[in-house]
């Protein structure tokens, strides 16, 4: 979620538990095929009643031809209706033919994510969720780097150094998230400098060193890498 808001899209009916999670997030709106009565009442309270709640028809079928106009010129192409299923992954070209079921699930999630992400696009998936997406870049290796840095940050947020941060009670969730992002990056002194950290942390944390980050990242395994087209050069890998 963006610190300044985002739209949330759900593929199933929004229930009460999901609505409670959404209610505390900075968000501009939600779209779903339906809402339970209690969930709808919770979401109506968000943004003093100005929160966008959209219901989509789950039976809607888009037109087979997509059209876009650019300065009076109409471009059209067939809609991407590729059915992503296990058959797409049946041709295993590596020496090792044994792929765990969990990896096959992550591969399908990667393909679904990339199907609806602006090209060029690359994503990393782990344990059933996309942990890093790089999209809309002219160079595929730039997509890989962008997605990889997001995946690294996702895992670094689970490190003992980050989980042990003690924030001042008055700091909001969005500001905490931003402080964590800066703390993990190269500009960490922006939150650790004297006169600054006191407004963020109860106790000044030590620098999260490059060596410590590398050691933690080396523990990450079972990550799936996906691309919306072939990798033209081995440097992406």
Language-model features: locations:
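ATP-dependent carboxylate/acyl-activation modules
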Residues: 1-237
């Amino acid at each position: 979620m963006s610190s300044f808001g985002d739209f949330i899209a759900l593929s199933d009916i929004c229930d009460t538990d999901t609505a409670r999670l959404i209610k505390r997030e900075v968000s501009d709106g939600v779209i779903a095929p339906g809402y339970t009565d209690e969930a709808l009442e919770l979401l109506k309270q968000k943004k003093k009643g100005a929160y966008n709640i959209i219901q989509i028809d789950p039976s809607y079928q888009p037109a087979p031809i997509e059209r876009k106009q650019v300065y009076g010129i109409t471009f059209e192409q067939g809609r991407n209706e590729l059915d992503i299923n296990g058959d797409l992954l049946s041709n295993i070209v590596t020496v090792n033919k044994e792929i765990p079921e969990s990896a096959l699930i992550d591969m399908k999630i990667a393909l679904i994510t990339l199907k609806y992400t602006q090209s060029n696009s690359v994503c990393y998936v782990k344990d059933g969720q996309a942990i890093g997406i790089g999209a809309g870049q002219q160079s595929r290796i730039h997509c890989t780097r962008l997605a990889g840095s997001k995946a690294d940050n996702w895992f670094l947020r689970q490190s003992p150094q980050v989980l042990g941060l003690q924030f001042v009670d008055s700091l909001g969730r969005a500001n905490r998230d931003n402080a964590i992002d800066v703390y993990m990056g190269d500009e960490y002194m922006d939150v650790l400098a004297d006169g600054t950290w006191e407004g963020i942390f109860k106790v000044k944390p030590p620098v999260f060193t490059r060596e410590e980050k590398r050691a933690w990242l080396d523990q990450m395994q079972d990550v799936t890498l996906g691309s919306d087209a072939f990798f033209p050069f081995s440097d992406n890998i």
